[in-house]
Amino acid sequence: RKLEAGNCCKNCAAKLSPWFNDRRQSTVEEIKEQLAYREANKEKVAAFHITRTLGEDTKVLLDEDAGLFMVTASRNLADANPDVLAFSDVTGCKLDIDERKTEIEYRDAEGKRQSFTPCRYAYSYDFYIVINVNNPYFNEIRFQLNDSAVDNDAETLLDGPDAVRPMRGGTRPG
């Protein structure tokens, strides 16, 4: 794996924090420092006492007695070695929403795709939490909240310009 001035073997790259993304701009010495940090982190993981779990797939694990947390999707904490951080390392938190829109079209009498006027769209969303942290190797932890896109299940190709999309959840009161 390429570094700013040198290389990092595949085994060492796998030991780096999953939240670290500046490998190519790092020196060999900086990588060695992070590997030492990650090795010391194993002891923190072993001593971590989960008092609360937040989330389904990716989880925020809290050790409220020690004021620590970690974020991981792994069931085997010893193997995953998730970064153990202090509550005081958190500098901010936000919800990040990725929106995608797909144009809804219809087939005309000749079977060709046509756009509505004005254009109609189907939307889907993915929701992410971004936890900003004070850490020498990464400054944010970003993970997806939903396990599949949240959408309105709209058909994006209708049989004709007068075709009506079924509404989910019934109608809204007047």
Regions found by a protein language model. Name each.
Residues T91-G174:
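Acidic, Ser/Thr- and proline-rich intrinsically disordered linker/docking segments
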Residues L3, A13-D83:
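Anionic N-terminal interaction surfaces
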Residues V84-G92:
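Amphipathic alpha-helical segments
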Residues C8:
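The −1 position to Zn-ligating cysteines in a subset of zinc-ribbon hairpins
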